[in-house]
């Protein structure tokens, strides 16, 4: 699964929800943040083994160095085979969710992202939408944040925020997306 969208659009929350509402929810949920070029095949295999039957999120995959992308292609295309660092056959059953800020297809065209890895990751694609393009969700998000702040109360944003303030919040640009709305609501 490939999840693309701007920073702050809750891509990792979406990845967690996919995991939590799947048959894999009892198994590990691991995140590999943009690694340096020193990630080894053995380290990646160890992470796959630890996450077996669960979900591995490749966070900011669009920033992975080409050497790591090549390593991922090798590991993902040999999920049921032999590896250089492990002579015995190892079998992994791991859902891979890749998260990217940028349009990966454009990076493929520029030569900064491996075409083969793009095709391996993009069997299913999801695009998160920035808050400025879904302003109608702002009252619901504010209500959700209020529930987080005031557990077990019947407070809603229309009881706390004036109509003028809600109108202002709906018109604001939100360059920080949902994170910025969350911080404003605190």
Regions found by a protein language model. Give the residues of each.
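Conserved catalytic core of Hanks-type protein kinase domains
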Residues: 50, 75, 120
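Residues immediately C-terminal
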Residues: 63-64, 104
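Hydrophobic/aliphatic anchor position in the core parallel beta-sheet
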Residues: 29, 55, 81, 96-98
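Structural recognition of the conserved hydrophobic beta-strand(s) that form the central parallel beta-sheet
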Residues: 57-59, 74, 93-101
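Conserved post-Walker A coupling segment in P-loop NTPases
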Residues: 1-63, 130-135, 184-185
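Nucleotide-binding/hydrolysis machinery
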Residues: 6, 10, 22-26, 70, ...
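Short gly/ser/thr-rich secondary-structure transition/capping motifs
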Residues: 37-40, 77-83
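Post-Walker A connector loop of ABC transporter nucleotide-binding domains
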Residues: 20-21, 74-78
């Amino acid at each position: 699964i490939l999840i693309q969208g701007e920073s702050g659009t809750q891509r990792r929350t979406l990845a967690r929800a996919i995991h939590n509402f799947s048959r894999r929810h009892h198994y590990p949920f691991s995140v590999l943040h943009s690694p340096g070029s020193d990630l080894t095949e053995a380290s990646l295999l160890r992470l796959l083994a630890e996450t077996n039957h669960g979900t591995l999120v490749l966070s900011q995959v669009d920033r992975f160095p080409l050497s790591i992308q090549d390593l991922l292609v090798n590991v993902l295309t040999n999920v049921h085979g032999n590896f250089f660092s492990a002579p015995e056959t190892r079998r992994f059953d791991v859902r891979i969710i890749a998260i990217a800020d940028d349009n990966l297809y454009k990076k493929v065209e520029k030569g900064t992202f491996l075409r083969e890895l793009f095709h391996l990751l993009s069997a299913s694609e999801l695009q998160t939408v920035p808050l400025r393009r879904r302003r109608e969700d702002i009252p619901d998000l504010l209500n959700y944040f209020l529930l987080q702040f005031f557990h077990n109360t019947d407070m809603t944003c229309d009881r706390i925020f004036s109509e003028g303030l809600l109108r202002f919040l709906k018109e604001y640009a939100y360059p920080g997306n949902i994170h910025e709305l969350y911080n404003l609501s605190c």
